[in-house]
Amino acid sequence: MPAPVVKKPAAKKLPAVPESKLKFSKKQISKRVAESKRRLKKAAVIALRKKENLVRAEKYQNEYIKAEQREIKLRRLAKKRNQFYVPAEAKLAFVVRIRGINKVAPKVRKVLQLFRLRQINNGVFIKLNKATINMLRIAEPYITWGYPNLKSVRELIYKRGFVKHNRQRVPITDNFVIERKLRQAHQIQCVEDLVHEIFTVGPNFKYASNFLWPFKLNTPTGGWRKKANHYVNGGDFGNREDQINRLLRKMV
């Protein structure tokens, strides 16, 4: 007698996935892949920039050391020959406003506006030439200024540096703040580039200094004591030459 035929249960059909859902899933996967590629590319660019910035910083440091050694050598040579060593004329000044606007002459007010010194204890870097030296003389009773060294320039930018972005005052928190504004047109992509351009008064000094927001400094310990007197007479205003660096130690 033949064995009874056992019917196999029909396989359950999976519900069909709507075409719209399949398209959406495919789109999401494509988005994730694109985002992943974008992140990898960005990480590679950041790594490259970091490497470039380290190379630049090292190059600048060597340049500063060589310049200092050359200066020392020239001083020693002059001393050996019983001569006076005359250093090169300063190209860079740092200017600080020390007085308010009461009874300010229109010419003085205009100079202070051009220098962007709108408040007491505001400071800016200025390229020294015939025009700016004349402007400094006009505004002299309201400002003090001098020749900043590398340490002062660095401390000002690293500790007190703010830049202009979309008309806003933005702190220098990383190199990207500088790169997005100055890299393409002016080859300045990191803080050390900015320090170098300012300190050496490079070809892009105008753009670098205008990019920096005027520095807001502390009042020096004890305050401004003799604003009405020139620095050479024991007062506060006027050219301090290299002694501006001592003042900046108290204000940064």
UniProtKB/Swiss-Prot annotation:
This is Large ribosomal subunit protein uL30. Keywords: Ribonucleoprotein, Ribosomal protein, RNA-binding. One of its GO terms (cellular component) is cytosolic large ribosomal subunit. InterPro entries: Ribo_uL30_ferredoxin-like_sf, Ribosomal_uL30, Ribosomal_uL30_CS, Ribosomal_uL30_euk, Ribosomal_uL30_euk_arc, Ribosomal_uL30_ferredoxin-like, Ribosomal_uL30_N_euk. One of its GO terms (molecular function) is structural constituent of ribosome. GO terms for biological process: cytoplasmic translation; maturation of LSU-rRNA from tricistronic rRNA transcript (SSU-rRNA, 5.8S rRNA, LSU-rRNA); pupariation. Belongs to the universal ribosomal protein uL30 family. Gene3D superfamilies: 1.10.15.30, Ribosomal protein L30, ferredoxin-like fold domain. It comes from Drosophila melanogaster. The gene is RpL7. It comes from the Eukaryota. Binds to G-rich structures in 28S rRNA and in mRNAs. Plays a regulatory role in the translation apparatus; inhibits cell-free translation of mRNAs. Transmembrane segments: none annotated.
